[in-house]
Amino acid sequence: MSFKPLHDRIAIKPIENEEKTKGGIIIPDTAKEKPMQGEIVAVGNGVLNKNGEIYPLELKVGDKVLYGKWAGTEIEIKGEKLIVMKESDVFGIIN
């Protein structure tokens, strides 16, 4: 993949939810929730402050993160679905 987000944006590859419940019930596609966690695959350079200095982003490629259900914009590059959002739309890093 060759995609570089600009400024304070990040690209996330969503981690799909399970297709079965713990009890073994298969969840149809129409009933699945949108993923709310994913792995960061690309980050922008950071944000410019008033003095023209760049503040680098706290998140980095490889971080697994939790984000809002409706955050970001879905895109597709070379058949891979990604979500692009601002770093501030991420709730936190999953350890």
UniProtKB/Swiss-Prot annotation:
SMART domains: Cpn10 (SM00883). Keywords: Chaperone, Cytoplasm, Stress response. The keyword Cytoplasm applies. GO terms for molecular function: ATP binding; metal ion binding; protein folding chaperone; protein-folding chaperone binding; unfolded protein binding. Its main location: cytoplasm. GO terms for cellular component: cytoplasm. This is Co-chaperonin GroES. The lineage of its organism: Bacteria, Pseudomonadati, Pseudomonadota, Alphaproteobacteria, Rickettsiales.
